[in-house]
Swiss-Prot record:
Pfam families: DUF134 (PF02001)
Transmembrane feature ranges: none
Family affiliation: Belongs to the UPF0251 family.
The protein's name: UPF0251 protein VV2_0946
HAMAP family, per database record: UPF0251
InterPro entries attached to this UniProt entry: UPF0251 (IPR002852), WH-like_DNA-bd_sf (IPR036388)
Gene3D superfamilies the record matches: Winged helix-like DNA-binding domain superfamily/Winged helix DNA-binding domain
Length: 100
């Protein structure tokens, strides 16, 4: 039985709900869901270009956990780009974690 997920600090939510290949209806394509913590890890590491330790501290997780999250996120994005799948993103109705 896996351990319960610890709360993570999420700095922002996306402005879009999904990305998909152009010209193909979304209902005809397989979907991969990007979790809120995975999107935040991508934002911190790739957009803000923070080191893993800084990004992990910002999210309230260990550096090892951050490394696992960013690896999972990059894998999902790469699969969607290479295999032409729909990438669904967390939406505004999900709870946004507040900084303590």
């Amino acid at each position: 039985m896996p351990r319960p997920k610890k709360p993570r600090t999420i700095g922002c939510l996306p402005k879009a709900s999904c990305f998909k290949p152009n010209g193909i209806p979304a209902h005809n394509l397989p979907r991969i869901a990007l979790e809120a913590d995975e999107l935040e890890a991508l934002r911190l590491a790739d957009v803000l270009q923070l080191h893993q330790l800084e990004a992990a501290q910002s999210m309230g997780v260990s550096r090892q956990t951050f490394g696992n999250i960013i690896k999972r996120a990059r894998n999902k994005v790469a699969l969607c780009l290479v295999e032409g799948k729909v990438l669904t993103l967390p939406n505004q109705s999900q709870d946004k974690e507040k900084e303590a």
